Amino acid sequence: MILTVTLNPAIDVSYPLDELKCDTVNRVVDVTKTPGGKGLNVCRVLNDFGETVKATGCIGGESGDFIINHLPDSILSRFYKISGDTRTCIVILHEGNQTEILEKGPLLSVEEIDGFTHHFKYLLNDVDVVTLSGSLPAGMPDDYYQKLIGIANLNGKKTVLDCSGNALEAVLKGDSKPTVIKPNLEELSQLLGKEMTKDFEALKEVLQDELFEGIEWIIVSLGADGVFAKHNDTFYNVDIPKIEIVSAVGSGDSTVAGIASGLANDEDDRALLTKANVLGMLNAQEKTTGHVNMANYDKLYQSIKVKEV
């Protein structure tokens, strides 16, 4: 079983407009509301793929109830209730652009943070892999993911971390290391303080930096150009075919789902990397974020090339 953690979930509200007009009224006909947050995208894709998955995180208020009520019944909902209201994130789709308005979310008390920590320990009993995705809510210290990873490691669970900024830096500088991290080039550049490109030799060099010591898998997203990955001392380049993209939103989360599934099923390197990329591509072919059409899985799987470099 796989446990997905979304500490700062949201209701995602999508407003499609032909044109966004400032300082006046914009009327929207087709409004879409869905449970949002990177970890919730992960759990929905895992569910589509047929994995047994349970979802946790911190939720509160009517928005929190909306999230629970709008997840598929086959996902085991194990959220921790807090006093604050779960946030709303607005996406305005206009003239080929995407403008996002993101609420910060609720402020958690020390008691709520401690409560979730105990809740997390309890949920580990029957899981093999834990995914930790997205931003931390207000009130949680930057090293909170580091704390959860330490607990998971003590219980023999594999962990996949997908976050950025101070939370990621705290993990990299801490003692407890995740099994997998999945930065993109922009996040990698931010971590290293220099611009990174798709140059394989340069990527090889930086991924051997002591900053990443102790992390089994480093999987760097190259967008439409696939993935560059390091597993222990072996490096891989993953070539993916060109596809017609409907929406790339959530594709990174879908890739995390594939990584988690590969770990849970003890798959070899090539199978894990291929599955992860297929699920990311399948999400990009869908209008709905965090959804994959498995009818196209086998065809894409055969078109991906994983090369040791």
UniProtKB/Swiss-Prot annotation:
GO BP field: D-tagatose 6-phosphate catabolic process; lactose catabolic process via tagatose-6-phosphate
Family: Belongs to the carbohydrate kinase PfkB family. LacC subfamily.
A Pfam entry, by short name: PfkB
Source lineage: Bacteria, Bacillati, Bacillota, Bacilli, Lactobacillales
Species of the source: Streptococcus pyogenes serotype M5 (strain Manfredo)
Top enzyme class: transferase
EC number: 2.7.1.144
Protein name per Swiss-Prot or TrEMBL: Tagatose-6-phosphate kinase
Keyword Kinase: yes
InterPro entries for this protein: LacC, PfkB_dom, Ribokinase-like, Tagatose/fructose_Pkinase
